Design a protein with these regions (language model features):
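Conserved G1/Walker A P-loop phosphate-binding module
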Residues: 13-103, 107-109
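Conserved glycine(s) of the Walker
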Residues: 44, 190, 282
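Conserved, well-folded catalytic cores of nucleic-acid-processing
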Residues: 55, 74, 78, 93, ...
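Conserved C-terminal guanine-recognition region of P-loop GTPase G domains, centered on the G4
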Residues: 79, 103-178, 251-254
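G-domain G4 guanine-recognition motif of GTPases
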Residues: 87, 119-122, 146-160, 181-190, ...
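Canonical P-loop GTPase G-domain recognition
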Residues: 143-144, 153-215
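P-loop NTP-binding site
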Residues: 219-327
Length: 327
């Protein structure tokens, strides 16, 4: 099964869906564009995209470097279509997987019609923040830059002036961004205002994707990520970063039941034991937590089978990276 994910339909939005799917209903002044979410790991890029879309397209966790691929999230309204490009956090890579992730983020910059540079305003700028600001200035000089000061809910009152000023000055003496907004993606603070700023930057253009499509990810790809999300949730230390998930089979057994089989790859035998757990309890816990999310994705019951396999040092092995879909 290789099916792109679309918005759920109900009686309330049925007519709206029909209008969004009708090419004749697109107004002549329709706006559209690709908007890249850029920033270091764990600043809230995926959370922001999910919240703006009103649905979960990208997995989230407190762990840095959760996002490994560029993921599109598509917002379609009668007057505009925004294609958000959620990207891996830009960091200083230590292995080929990290290089792949950073390249995926960097390649999104010149492709974007607008850039959301996201930072964690509750802490002072890091060297990575400064590097990313320069990367944006040099890599996309013509695209509007919106500086998103996220995690405002964690910002202490006495920090506001100093932290904001430090981020405003990241690009040097000259103003390097077009507008800024303080937000809390988790609480939904100021997101309507941010969306207005994003739409204001968009050029007039066509509807690039069908009006009911919300992502470029297939059900199989999202299911793999939903399983990995639970591994991130329940494991500790180096194990979460050493895991990759591949869905081997995604098959409808009836109109109300899908069968999903997936391999969880780790780098060492000791990690395999941790994920399986005593008497298989950890693996059962991961499966039990992932299954309801996959059922919400498919709208059916899901029979989920998980297998744990060792692919030694796969993050440093180019051939294994390709096998796991990272090349």
């Amino acid at each position: 099964m290789c099916q792109y994910v679309h918005r759920e339909k109900n009686k309330m939005n049925e007519q709206a869906d029909l209008n969004l799917l009708d090419p004749e209903a697109i107004p002549p002044d329709h706006q559209s564009g690709f908007v890249a979410l850029i920033g270091r790991p764990n600043v809230g890029k995926s959370t922001l995209m999910n919240t703006l879309l009103g649905t979960k397209v990208a997995i989230v966790s407190p762990r840095p470097q959760t996002t490994r691929n560029r993921i599109l999230g598509i917002m379609t309204k009668p007057q505009f279509q925004i294609i958000f490009m959620d990207t891996p956090g830009i960091h200083r890579p230590k292995h080929p997987l990290g290089e792949y992730m950073v390249n995926a983020a960097q390649h999104a910059i010149p492709d974007a019609d607008a850039l959301l540079f996201m930072v964690d305003v509750s802490v002072e700028p890091t060297p990575e923040d400064r590097d990313i600001a320069q990367l944006i200035i040099q890599g996309s000089p013509d695209a509007p830059v919106l500086l998103v000061l996220n995690k405002m809910d964690r910002l202490k009152p006495e920090q506001v002036k100093a932290h904001c000023q430090a981020y405003w000055n990241l690009g040097g003496s000259e103003k390097w961004y077009d507008s800024w907004m303080m937000t809390s993606a988790t609480l939904g603070e100021n997101l309507d205002e941010l969306l207005e700023q994003i739409v204001a930057t968009l050029p007039q253009g066509p509807r690039y994707y069908p009006g009911d499509q919300i992502t470029d990810q297939t059900e199989r790809q999202i299911a793999a990520e939903l399983i990995r999300e639970q591994v991130l949730r329940y494991t500790r230390q180096e194990v979460p970063h050493s895991v990759a998930v591949v869905v081997n089979e995604f098959k409808a057994r009836s109109e109300t039941l899908n069968y999903v089989s997936a391999n969880i790859f780790v780098e060492r035998t000791s990690q395999k034991g941790i994920i399986i757990g005593k008497q298989g309890k950890m693996l059962k816990k991961i499966g039990a937590a992932a299954r309801p999310n996959i059922e919400r994705l498919t709208g059916t019951k899901v029979y989920l089978e998980l297998w744990v396999k060792v692919s030694e040092d796969w993050r440093r092995n180019e051939q294994q990276l390709r096998h796991l879909g990272f090349r």
